[in-house]
């Protein structure tokens, strides 16, 4: 008799919530259905948008007979890495001028986080420091916890961020957690357009955060998934990172080009490393090269070529900034329209937070039972946390969504 399958005892893993939501939406035959869960940009026709500048560059690449399919270097396409780091740190960055910046091309922002996490677990402030506390905001993007856990970190803690009552930043709680964290702890910070709350510190608040972090020797690991997409202004969205660098911090920054280039399935990311001197950055990169070699070995070329070609050409760069602003402006419009409708309906509660938050997501303040009502009764799909993607709203479904939220809030406590 043959033995049972060696996989017989493997338990079924729960589905990834945001992708299950999209699958449920797709299978729903109801014509009223609205998907507010998807983590990607949509046009006013609810369609994905390929940026015109990306189409143009793809055509140029297709017609360039000098290009081939040879392996890229382990750390990635050199032009892409330097352009990506320059985009986040700025053209006049002192750190770049002093050659103490490095980049690692990664498989999206998640890949950048994972390479950074693996490196920190092995080499941060000594060797094999997986007991170093990792602090992530409460709430945060669910993958932050998962990535650092998978990298072997044993002590992952939340820090205060969201004040549910006032629907804004809990600055005092945040500062208290910084003060009480063990020295040399690692803090994962959202550079802009905080996911899921859409609430960012102001520049003055960032200065207070940086001052405590510097005094307590805390290490900033920025996640920058939305540069340009948050406010429509590339410089403004990178302000926090640039300020930390100007204050002399060593830091990591995981960058994603999924949202601001619309290159979701090309997996284009970069891990920017800022050190105190060029020698240490070179040593860091040498160790990251070893980590990449056993992770994906060599990154893909197409997305990196598109980004590098766009960022290095003044005309294409200008066109790209216009494309990004188109996306950011549509989101801002949807925010103000949704708020106006809820206020016109006299929906209980305050709704000013919808326009005060920025980026793709809004933390509505809806509770899980109200969300359940919207999903089951109204066929409006959103996460149990009440997070909605503003891009799921269109001029055609705004009224329906607003009246449905009004019903949920008035009927269900």
Curated annotation (Swiss-Prot):
It comes from Mus musculus. Its main location: cytoplasm. Gene3D superfamilies: Aspartate Aminotransferase, domain 1, Type I PLP-dependent aspartate aminotransferase-like (Major domain). This is Aspartate aminotransferase, cytoplasmic. Coiled coil: none annotated. GO terms for molecular function: carboxylic acid binding; L-aspartate:2-oxoglutarate aminotransferase activity; L-cysteine transaminase activity; phosphatidylserine decarboxylase activity; pyridoxal phosphate binding. Homodimer. It is an enzyme of class 2 (transferase). The modification N6-(pyridoxal phosphate)lysine is found at residue 259. The modification Phosphoserine is found at residue 149. L-aspartate binds at residues 39, 141, 195, 387. Expressed in neurons of the retina. Localizes to the inner and outer plexiform layers, the inner and outer nuclear layer and the outer segments of photoreceptors. One of its GO terms (biological process) is aspartate metabolic process. PANTHER family: ASPARTATE AMINOTRANSFERASE, ASPARTATE AMINOTRANSFERASE, CYTOPLASMIC. CDD domains: AAT_like (cd00609). Its cofactor is pyridoxal 5'-phosphate. Its EC number is 2.6.1.1, 2.6.1.3. The modification N6-succinyllysine is found at residue 318. Inhibited by calcium ions. In eukaryotes there are cytoplasmic, mitochondrial and chloroplastic isozymes. It is found in: Cytoplasm. It catalyses: L-aspartate + 2-oxoglutarate = oxaloacetate + L-glutamate; L-cysteine + 2-oxoglutarate = 2-oxo-3-sulfanylpropanoate + L-glutamate; (2S)-2-aminobutanoate + 2-oxoglutarate = 2-oxobutanoate + L-glutamate; 3-sulfino-L-alanine + 2-oxoglutarate = 3-sulfinopyruvate + L-glutamate. Keywords: Amino-acid biosynthesis, Aminotransferase, Cytoplasm, Phosphoprotein, Pyridoxal phosphate, Transferase.
């Amino acid at each position: 008799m043959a033995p049972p399958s060696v996989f017989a005892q493997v338990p079924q893993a729960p589905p990834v919530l945001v992708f299950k939501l999209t699958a449920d939406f797709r299978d729903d035959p109801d014509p009223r259905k609205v998907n507010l869960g998807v983590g990607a940009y949509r046009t006013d026709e609810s369609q994905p948008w390929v940026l015109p500048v990306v189409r143009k560059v793809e055509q140029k690449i297709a017609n360039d007979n000098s290009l081939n399919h040879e392996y890229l270097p382990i750390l990635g396409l050199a032009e892409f890495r330097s352009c990506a780091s320059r985009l986040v740190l700025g053209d006049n960055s002192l750190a770049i001028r002093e050659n103490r910046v490095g980049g690692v091309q990664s498989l999206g922002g998640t890949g950048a986080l994972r390479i950074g996490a693996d490196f920190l677990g092995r080499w941060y402030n000594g060797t094999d420091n997986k007991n170093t506390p990792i602090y992530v905001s409460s709430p945060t993007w669910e993958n932050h916890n998962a990535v650092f856990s998978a990298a072997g970190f044993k002590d992952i803690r939340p820090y205060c961020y969201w004040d549910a009552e006032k629907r804004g930043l809990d600055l005092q709680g945040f500062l208290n957690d910084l003060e009480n964290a063990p020295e040399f702890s690692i803090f994962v910070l959202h550079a802009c357009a905080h996911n899921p709350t859409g609430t960012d510190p102001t520049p003055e608040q960032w200065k207070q955060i940086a001052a405590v972090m510097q005094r307590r020797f805390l290490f900033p690991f920025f996640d920058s998934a939305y540069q340009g997409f948050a406010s429509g202004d590339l410089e403004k969205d990178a302000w926090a990172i640039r300020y930390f660098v100007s204050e002399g911090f060593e830091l990591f920054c995981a960058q994603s080009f999924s949202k601001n280039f619309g290159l979701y399935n090309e997996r284009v990311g970069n891990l920017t490393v800022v050190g105190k001197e060029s020698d240490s950055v070179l040593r860091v990169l040498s160790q990251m090269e070893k980590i990449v070699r056993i992770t994906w070995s060599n990154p893909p070329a197409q997305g990196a070529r598109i980004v590098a070609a766009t960022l290095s050409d003044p005309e294409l760069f200008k066109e790209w900034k216009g494309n990004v602003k188109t996306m950011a402006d549509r989101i801002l419009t949807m925010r103000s329209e949704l708020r106006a409708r809820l206020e016109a309906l006299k929906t209980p509660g305050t709704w000013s937070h919808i326009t005060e938050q920025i980026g793709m997501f809004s933390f509505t303040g809806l509770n899980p039972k109200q969300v359940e009502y919207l999903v089951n009764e109204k066929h409006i799909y959103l996460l149990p946390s009440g997070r909605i993607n503003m891009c799921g709203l269109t001029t055609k479904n705004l009224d329906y969504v607003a009246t449905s939220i009004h019903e949920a809030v008035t009927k269900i406590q």
